[in-house]
Amino acid sequence: MAQNESVDVVLVGAGIMSATLAVLLKELDPTLKLEVVEAMDSGAAESSNPWNNAGTGHAGLCELNYTPQAADGSIDIKKAVHINTQFEVSRQFWAYLTKKGNFGSARAFINPVPHLSYVEGDKGVSFLKKRFELLKQHHAFAEMEYTEDKAVMNDWMPLMMPGRPADQHIAATRVAKGTDVNFGALTNKLLKLLGDSPDAQVKYSKKVVGLRRNGSGWTVSIKDVNSGGSREVDARFVFLGAGGAALPLLQLSGIPESKGFGGFPVSGQWLRCDNPEIVKQHQAKVYSQAAVGAPPMSVPHLDTRVVDGKTSLLFGPYAGFTTKFLKHGSLMDLPLSVRMGNIGPMLAVARDNMDLTKYLVSEVMQSMEQRLEALRRFYPQAKAEDWRLEVAGQRVQIIKKDPKKGGVLQFGTELVSAQDGSLAALLGASPGASVTVSIMLELIERCFPEQAKGAWAAKLKEIFPAREKTLATDAALYHKISADNDAALDLAESSPAAKHYA
């Protein structure tokens, strides 16, 4: 019998997660033999595709759900600070690769777009002002501005102001140095960098159909989507970074840590505008508050998008429900993911989240006119003929066991790894791509602890001069790292492009 091909690492899925981890591992140890396996015929074809996500460089600057308000009125800014520092870690990696000289222009994947929060009504205004006062005290948010002056808002977001009632009580905050990120372009840059490296392959139209233990590693069964042929690869480490498909693959591995996890797929839709006369009037990402009873991923926002050099506007998201785990997945994905170990948590979540289910169904049933009503809260003069509906990527929210409720629905990301560190999977969604680098560093520390503390420590320090905890507490270092990243990524205020968008 022919011997299986052997590699050090197999990464499943050619999206932002696998591409980041693969390039990072190659930087830490250029001798590693890596293989990326992707079922689609190109990279970044699912959630990393620029039109399958909002492209917000999530840094806690404008996302109001990152600063939740408790029943007593207090506001917690910890999550916003943490995500801000995580994004700064991502920017350190991109800046490092750009400065190396073989990564091309950063402007191909990241562009300066101001981040704004916008609220209506006395309650909303009170919340935003309190949030601003708290965030402003932290060095990461020192440049944030607040206004209730409609003339100032007209300057910040001119498309959104005409047609409003004169007595409407509104407020906004603005951070000029926000970003729009084309995660598809970034992913493909990383994959090209990987493909140009020795002992690294990216294989498309190849689907993982089996995972079985092989001593201290894994045997990965891979099927050719086109020919139907199959091969087996032995790997010391396997990463499941396949977006919505990560859960079924994790279940396939059979590791004890996978027991009890389920998935709740949520689809998304956007309204998109390419009319240059309208697009030029809005150069910002403006986030507001989710409707009462709506889930956190439904926070509405009106965004500038820069994709392949072309600027468009995007509004949404409008949520929906399907049983597919991927946009190009199967309607059987959800039913086939049910196991004896997760049926309890899944039923508990179904019982406790009837409001969410009703919300998703109502979103699916919306007419174009109803969708435009939501848009007109932001842009009162919006006309149907300027906007078209786009289907976004799938997000599989995590269902996990809970000792009290039986099961809970978790919004966010979760890294699940085998006890021996030989396999890891990334489950969940937001803030996702923006904090990829932080999550992959956590994976490296968890699955390669000896190397992270030993042979790889110096290189990690070179790539990442400051990590999240230090960035959160050392103001001078934060500002230095941030300025260095701005310069390397062509986001400094002195750059012509930065001036154009700010």
Swiss-Prot record:
Q: Which SUPFAM superfamilies match?
A: FAD/NAD(P)-binding domain
Output the superkingdom of the source species: Bacteria
E.C. numbers: 1.1.5.4
Gene Ontology terms for molecular function: 2-hydroxyglutarate dehydrogenase activity; L-malate dehydrogenase (quinone) activity
Which controlled-vocabulary keywords does the entry list? FAD, Flavoprotein, Oxidoreductase, Tricarboxylic acid cycle
Which cofactor does the UniProt annotation name? FAD
The UniProt entry, under HAMAP family, shows: MQO
UniProt-recorded name of the protein:
Probable malate:quinone oxidoreductase 1
| The gene coding this protein | mqo1
